[in-house]
Amino acid sequence: MKRTIAALTMVAVASAAENLIFNDDFNTFNLKTWEHELTLAGGGNWEFEWYVNNRSNSYVKDGVLYIKPTMTEDYIGTQALNSGSINIWGMSPAELCTGPQFYGCERSAAGSGNVNNPIRSARLRTVKSFSTKFGRVEVKAQLPKGDWLWPAIWMLPVSNEFGPWPASGEIDIMESRGNAPGYVAGGHDTFGSTLHWGTNYD
């Protein structure tokens, strides 16, 4: 099971010509460009993953960026997964939790009847290194196969200028699922794109 992004290009569209303003062919993994989110928040959807900055979950090889899920149990053990706590508030900037909402910096399975986030993966963003207002985005990607995988490529606002989500907007360039074709909500043979805006989700 793996997610890959082979290339990402951003082109500014002018009236007469297009100018390349951002490109990454992933010959190297530029961690100044690509910031890792560090959170247990599940994207506001109560997703299963724990987003980390670990080369087991995100790395570059032969011009390809790999985003790979791994089992949390292999990292913290069965007992901690089922009845322990995970605290990622961090003691240094490199380890600092980036998403405190939705209990994103600390989770506990102790006595709750729940388990801690069972999957570790990666979520990368350019919020501190690159943003643009207009242009065309081209992404070359191979989508994963596997139940419960949800690859997505989003454009999110740098700041909530018009208010909290969705008021400041969101462009979902691509979202898909790793499930087999025929899955009721769509499989890895389909994808969707969405625009979010307005005063509320409904």
Predicted regions located by residue number:
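Sec-dependent signal peptide recognition
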Residues: 1-7
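Hydrophobic h-region of N-terminal signal peptides that target proteins for export
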Residues: 8-17
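GH16 jelly-roll
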Residues: 17-202
